[in-house]
Amino acid sequence: MHHNPLLVGLLAALPLASGAIITGSHVPLTGYNLSWTIDDTAATIEVTVAAQTTGWVAFGIASSGGMYGADIMMATVDDSTGAASVNDYHAFSQVAPIMDEQQDWTLVSGSQADGWTTVTATRALVTGDLQDWALSATSSWTLLAAMGPSDSTTAMHAASSRTSYRVNLFRPQDGLISLIDTQVRTVPSVQSLDFQA
């Protein structure tokens, strides 16, 4: 059997096989567990955040190491009723994020138990919303992970360590690609990681 080397090379270069399901997980911040599933057929990403807080949790992506230009998913679980909610935000600087005009994250589930908030939400890889980043296997991004002390999404997150490193969401088996930056910050603080999505 003869193989066409050009065809073999092209197939090897494809970032995602048609119909592929990719799953991964990471602990970017102490008390903050992130997992994700990318469904190529549905062209969606499902994100689960489990954080040691009874306040808000957030997951975001940005083109740089900070909040400027960030595309953010913020979620809460009401302490009294247990009702969960998720909202789509964007940020221009180190101030409170602004809610998007178009809401592209859909809540799958949310719960609180033993001081932990767990929220799962999904969105299209490409939403068509100018306030969202389009996710693809060939793009590089910074991942933002944060949590707050209360359900008020205007409540600032506490001071903590900040770490930046590269992770490819479409190739989670590669693990940590490179450590970029570690420093202690004061409020506002955010844990950030560069990844290719």
Tell me what each language-model feature is:
Residues 9, 15-197:
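Extracellular-facing/secreted segment signature in eukaryotic proteins
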Residues 1-11:
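Classical eukaryotic N-terminal signal peptides for Sec-dependent ER targeting/secretion
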